[in-house]
């Protein structure tokens, strides 16, 4: 075997390590783990040592993160509800989403961003609600300040989002920082974009004091917006995600297509094009769209033509009970009648088996 072939064989393991990353965010599985904090910390697979240390040291924060997993997965499913891939989760898989996130696609970019944002939101909310020993309301929001409406006093409980961001960065990014490959850098970038998205919608709320609400004095505080705003924002970033390649020294990205702008810290980035998600593909992590409900009158992604990938659809005639003819009665009730509504439900056909697979 010549020296060239020897060199190729030596580099192949490194090449496959570079191109075939594992799904690193095993902490997502905390949603499905119950019991004491020690049991949880020791039984969530894939946590690195720093994550386990934080888990043992801050069991109350871990409970908040675990509750937050349910919230951001529901938000992910809401955003993808009309798409072929609908952010479906797998209860028995510690990666939560299965093999679909092994591909460095824009779906992976969104999930890492929304999960990181969900941790910030969950921790910050728990701080304000007095559920955590390590934090409370934002200690910096004290005294008097000014805005375009004049002078006001900081009061109430300002959301301590800086603590939420700091803890989320330390916990969520810990495993990625141990890696030096392209996927780790992609995940770190999208994690940061998710954290920044939550802070983007931090808003100032105020209460007036004075005779007849004259607002002689104002008390203000900072509050996070509903998580739906963060989800909607990251959905727009998903649709505008930028495909990138590693730069020559392996420390950052450059755009794959020179016609597109360089990604900012707020943008989502990805390396690989997405599969079409039309058929069940175990290796790609795709569940396919057979049996999915589609919209016969839509022209969007939820249309029967797009959702069913041209395979056609089945129509079922169903009835359901609804409230109708509602009337307001003084005071203070709304009374409705029970009505039966008939409607058609359209579901995607399964792919046809090839002729050679048909029974004889």
Curated annotation (Swiss-Prot):
Covalent lipidation (O-palmitoleoyl serine) residues? 212
Which pairs of positions does the record mark as disulfide bonds?
76-87, 127-135, 137-157, 206-220, 208-215, 278-309, 294-304, 308-348, 324-339, 326-336, 331-332
Provide the residues annotated with a glycan attachment (glycosylation): 295
* Post-translational modification note: Palmitoleoylation is required for efficient binding to frizzled receptors. Depalmitoleoylation leads to Wnt signaling pathway inhibition.
Q: Which GO terms describe its cellular component?
A: cytoplasm; extracellular space
Q: Where in the cell is it found?
A: Secreted, Extracellular space, Extracellular matrix; Secreted
Q: Which domain of life is it from?
A: Eukaryota
Q: Which family does it belong to?
A: Belongs to the Wnt family.
> What protein name applies here?
Protein Wnt-2
Source organism per entry reads Bos taurus
